């Protein structure tokens, strides 16, 4: 049976998933690190990645930005300012906000008991917060969600972060200037750090109640192998977790999926409880409003509220 990766802990605790024991190393090698992470809990692989297409990356207008510009956030902002354009990101949304913290090595995950771990208020988190504040204070930055991005890219906006679900609208707006790539690096503590992200995957699991686990594993492996994922992409447009399919000419011809595949190397599964989203959004909104005079206190509050919500 298939399941979204954010259900893995519930299924494991219900003893519903059979551990992958056949061709485990091969399956790990054939799929992206982010997808394998999504199918793994407490060091055990519990499923076969099928897709890896629920995530985010950078859309950009290549009449304004070069391939070199989009490698770094500094490059994007400098080129945007020079052209009188804006870079857009929904900083007041915890899903996107986390990219800075995750990129700088912070943790937002669950422990073995299913409790939320969030260390955004440590030294690395503070450095990431300072980078977010610098972004929000930059004249070429424009905060806002996906409606703003897909409506204004090609006009006031030259680049923005979102997912595949707006690719058709962005492509229509930009035409021949349509481009996409992985997220950029950002300046953090005087160094360039790659932005992280969340990646959502569909996973095929083997039911522990099966009387034929070997045959079930063989079937699951077949249904998620390279050829099956390629056919699924060609017929349905699903983004592959298989590294060979992700690197194929077929996927490369779809800039959004190619960008998502490139970003997946820096993505983690969304093991996040509901208590994170509201305080994270509030933290981002404060920085957008230029209210970041005591970042450490703000981070302490974010983490306290995130963890307290589960008690």
Task: Briefly describe each language-model feature range.
Residues 172-235:
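Extracytoplasmic/periplasmic substrate-recognition and gating elements
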Residues 3-56, 68, 179-183:
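Hinge/lid segment of periplasmic solute-binding proteins
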Residues 1-2, 158-163, 179:
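Paired acidic/hydrophobic, glycine-rich loop segments that form the ligand-binding mouth/hinge
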Residues 6-12, 164-177:
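A ligand-binding cleft/hinge motif common to bilobed small-molecule-binding domains
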């Amino acid at each position: 049976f298939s399941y979204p990766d954010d259900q893995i802990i519930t299924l494991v605790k219900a003893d519903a998933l059979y551990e992958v024991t056949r061709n485990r190393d091969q399956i790990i090698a054939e799929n992206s690190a982010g997808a394998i992470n999504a199918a793994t809990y407490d060091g055990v692989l519990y499923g076969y990645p099928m897709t890896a297409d629920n995530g985010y990356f950078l859309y950009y207008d290549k009449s304004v930005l070069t391939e070199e510009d989009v490698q770094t956030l500094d490059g994007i902002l400098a080129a945007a300012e020079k052209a009188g354009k804006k870079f857009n990101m929904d900083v007041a949304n915890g899903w996107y906000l986390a990219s800075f913290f995750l990129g700088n090595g912070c943790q937002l995950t669950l422990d073995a008991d299913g409790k939320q771990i969030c260390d955004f208020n440590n030294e690395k988190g503070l450095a990431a917060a300072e980078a977010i504040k610098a972004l929000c204070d930059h004249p070429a930055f424009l905060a806002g969600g996906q409606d703003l991005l897909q409506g204004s890219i090609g006009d006031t906006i030259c680049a923005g972060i979102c997912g595949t679900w707006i690719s058709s609208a962005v492509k229509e707006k930009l035409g021949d200037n349509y481009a996409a790539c992985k997220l950029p690096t950002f300046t953090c503590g005087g160094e360039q750090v790659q932005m992280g992200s969340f990646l959502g995957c569909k996973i095929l699991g083997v039911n522990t109640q099966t009387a034929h686990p070997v045959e079930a594993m063989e079937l699951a492996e077949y249904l998620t192998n390279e050829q099956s994922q390629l056919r699924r992409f060609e017929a349905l447009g699903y983004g592959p977790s298989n590294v060979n399919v992700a690197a194929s000419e077929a996927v490369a011809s779809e800039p959004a999926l190619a960008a998502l595949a490139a970003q997946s190397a820096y993505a983690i599964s969304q093991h996040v409880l509901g208590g994170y989203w509201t305080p994270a959004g509030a933290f981002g909104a404060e920085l957008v409003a230029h209210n970041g005079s005591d970042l450490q206190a703000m981070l302490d509050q974010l983490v306290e509220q995130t963890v307290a919500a589960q008690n």
